[in-house]
Amino acid sequence: LGDVYKRQILDIGGQDMKCIKIKNQTVDSVQLNEACSSGCGSFIETFAKSLNFSVQDFAKEALFAKNPIDLGTRCTVFMNSKVKQAQKEGASVADISAGLAYSVIKNALFKVIKLSDASDLGENIVVQGGTFYNDAVLRSFEKIAGVHATRPDIAGIMGAFGAALIARERHTADYKTTMLTIDQI
């Protein structure tokens, strides 16, 4: 990375993931996953449902894993096969859930951000996006990156919150919307 960024924001949502690098209090760069939703919240949700778990209960299971399965950073098709094989071999739900949490983070760090070493991330990391409500994903990030991450209480709505702050800042009393009403449509 050359210069260590003052702060980085890792955002993993239901369908995408991004890394926003802040330098001199300004967004310096944004990296976004290109196509696959592997490692995003919907991916974990699908697995949880396939095993008859809520996302919350599935995430809690991961915290009791003894041997998380290694799914690497592959696409969902390959991960599905790997999970099915692990199930046949007797892997517990906890080990599957933890393996998925690790794969989410590995995918974000090594495929999206394209780090060669997790320590290149720096130390001032804010995580956001609904996927980070999953404590297993947060803990996996902290273990792999070797840092303590800051997770706001409103991690899942940080983007909307930021947009609302900008709208409030730019609002003027005499502003008239150009948005069509239902009757005009």
Task: Go through each PLM region and give its residues.
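Gly/Thr-rich phosphate-binding beta-strand-loop-beta motif of the actin/hexokinase/Hsp70
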Residues: 6-23
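Adenine-nucleotide phosphate-binding core of ATP-dependent small-molecule kinases
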Residues: 81-110
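Glycine-rich phosphate-binding loop plus the immediately following alpha-helix
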Residues: 24-67, 156-159, 165-169
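Internal, active-site/partner-interface "lid" segment
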Residues: 54-85, 175-184
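Acidic, glycine/GT-rich loop-and beta-edge segments that sit at the periphery of enzyme/chaperone cores
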Residues: 18, 166-185
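Short, small-residue-biased leader/transition segments that mark boundaries at the very start
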Residues: 1-5
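Glycine-rich phosphate-binding loops at beta-strand->alpha-helix junctions
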Residues: 103, 116-142, 155-159
